[in-house]
Amino acid sequence: QRILEHEYEEIIRDDFSDYGHLHLIIRQGKSVGVEPDEIINAEPLPETRATLYAWSWMTSEMPWTESLAGMTITEWCNDDRLLGDLGGGQSTRMAKKWMDEMGFTWKQIPNLQAHSQADEKHSDMFLPFLAEHATGSKEAPAIQAAKDSLAFNAMYRKGIALAQEKIPL
């Protein structure tokens, strides 16, 4: 039920969009002059494709405790409560850069705004299950899955950074 609740909020509706998080990306794209069709039909970067394949494999082939640990830590990456000493989670830090360096407002970057807040709830959503079930001999593999997921996330982010460096100014 918790997984379905999480996916419902990401794909269907939550406090930030009546149409799911893709709608937030489309709205944010308008702020930078990207049309909805360009977003929907975008060819993924190789690093993005590899990361999505890795996460897909993790969630379909690994034991559920490892899958859950691997996916939960991606929510932690956006949790301002956990990363306040670093300036906040990934979405908050990116939003601050967009606002400071390019003059955007929170309203113009709804995907970043939503993820700077929604992922706090998502960070907590599965912890009781991990605390109960990722114990004993299941603890170390769950921790390793979380570490692997962080590596996948770093690869994904690096791919975006490399692509951004190629954009002519």
Q: What are these model-derived regions, one by one?
A:
Residues 1-169:
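Non-heme di-metal
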